[in-house]
From Swiss-Prot:
PANTHER family: NADH-UBIQUINONE OXIDOREDUCTASE CHAIN 2 (PTHR46552:SF1). This is NADH-ubiquinone oxidoreductase chain 2. The chain crosses the membrane at residues 3-23, 25-45, 67-87, 96-116, 122-142, 145-165, 200-220, 238-258, 273-293, 324-344. It catalyses: a ubiquinone + NADH + 5 H(+)(in) = a ubiquinol + NAD(+) + 4 H(+)(out). The lineage of its organism: Eukaryota, Metazoa, Chordata, Craniata, Vertebrata. The gene is MT-ND2. Keywords: Electron transport, Membrane, Mitochondrion, Mitochondrion inner membrane, NAD, Respiratory chain, Translocase, Transmembrane, Transmembrane helix, Transport, Ubiquinone. It comes from the Eukaryota.
Length: 346
């Protein structure tokens, strides 16, 4: 892709997201979502093959449907209130449609079916943008309208997302699909804690950091399957250790960073005398931890059959420069001791 065109597309994606986050008018929010959607499709189709075309088409149809639901909710709200303000939804039907539209854009269950297929069909770099940056705009709108949302509806979507995000990743060998199901589960944790926006923001930051770290290491090793992940010992032994730590952190294993948001969300829910919901969420999170432990096992403790050429890859240095990777790994794995400092947010 032409560098000027690529830069223009990236700037459009950033502008669309920023437009959604800073706008207080529903029409500007809708325009921001459309800019975001139309700009990312050429990036998803960087590799000209049928799989990328199929993934881009699925993404376009899903996001178009979500945008249609969003505009329908805005029009219903306008009929009842006469206002275009983002902060408040005055009609229960408008609130329900808006929640469904944003859940579809975030890839939450039961509107999650597009996420694994689209992520699997696009390059790793496009998957990184899809699973990180593209979550910011819908999450910011969801945060702004949370007082108007039916609490039972959003908690149901959260529980379904955590459950399906864990179940779906159990039988996967494709790393992009595993990251997609992990994204679905993390969206469930974030929306379950929307009543405490600081914890939602903390969860979002840690999720984006961990996901960016994993995709950066996958791209450095050109790794897309469990089999190719097991060969990283031959290519970059040190990076293999970093992959292990980040995988366990994404699974929420203490004492790594990924445990922090889960711990704080469960603690906050129990303070509000909610026992059954956090217990179910904690048990369901074990499904995610299981498939991450399985990835860790196949990477660190097993060696799949490989040719002699594959075994000699350690002789050739990794030529890709990754300036920010050490910082990202530290943030993804070692921030749990900073948890007491977060008490100032309460």
């Amino acid at each position: 892709m032409n560098p000027i065109i690529f830069t223009t597309i990236l700037l459009t994606i950033m502008l669309g997201t920023n437009n959604v986050m800073i706008s207080s008018h529903w029409l500007l929010v809708w325009i921001g979502f459309e800019m975001n959607m139309l700009a990312i499709i050429p990036i998803m189709m960087k590799n000209h093959n049928p799989r990328a075309t199929e993934a881009s088409t699925k993404y376009f149809l899903t996001q178009s449907t979500a945008s249609m639901l969003l505009m329908m909710a805005v029009i219903i709200n306008l009929m009842f209130s006469g206002q275009w303000t983002v902060m408040k939804l005055f009609n229960p039907m408008a609130s329900m449609l808006m929640t469904m539209a944003l859940a579809m854009k975030l890839g939450m269950a039961p509107f999650h079916f597009w996420v694994p297929e689209v992520t699997q069909g696009i390059p790793l770099s496009s998957g990184l943008i899809l699973l990180t940056w593209q979550k910011l705009a819908p999450m910011s709108v969801l945060y702004q309208i949370f007082p108007s949302i039916n609490l039972n509806l959003i908690l149901t979507l959260s529980i379904l997302s955590i459950l399906i995000g864990g179940w779906g990743g159990l039988n996967q060998t494709q790393l992009r699909k595993i990251m997609a199901y992990s994204s679905i589960a993390h969206m469930g944790w974030m929306t379950a804690s929307l009543h405490t926006p600081y914890y939602t923001l903390l969860n979002l930051i840690i999720y984006i950091t961990m996901t960016s770290t994993m995709f950066t290491m996958f791209m450095a090793n050109s790794t897309t399957t469990t089999l190719s992940l097991s060969h990283t010992w031959n290519k970059t032994p040190i990076m293999t250790i970093l992959i292990l730590a980040t995988l366990l952190s994404m699974g929420g294993l203490p004492p790594l960073s990924g445990f922090m948001p889960k711990w704080m969300i469960i603690q906050e829910m129990t303070k509000n005398n909610s026992i059954i919901l956090p217990t179910f969420m904690a048990i369901t999170a074990l499904l995610n931890l299981y498939f991450y432990m399985r990835l860790t096992y196949s990477t660190a403790l097993t060696m799949f059959p490989s040719t002699n050429n594959m075994k000699m890859k350690w002789q050739f240095p990794l030529m890709k420069k990754m300036t920010f990777l050490p910082t990202m790994v530290v943030l993804s794995t070692m921030t749990l001791p900073l948890t007491p400092m977060l008490s100032v947010l309460e």
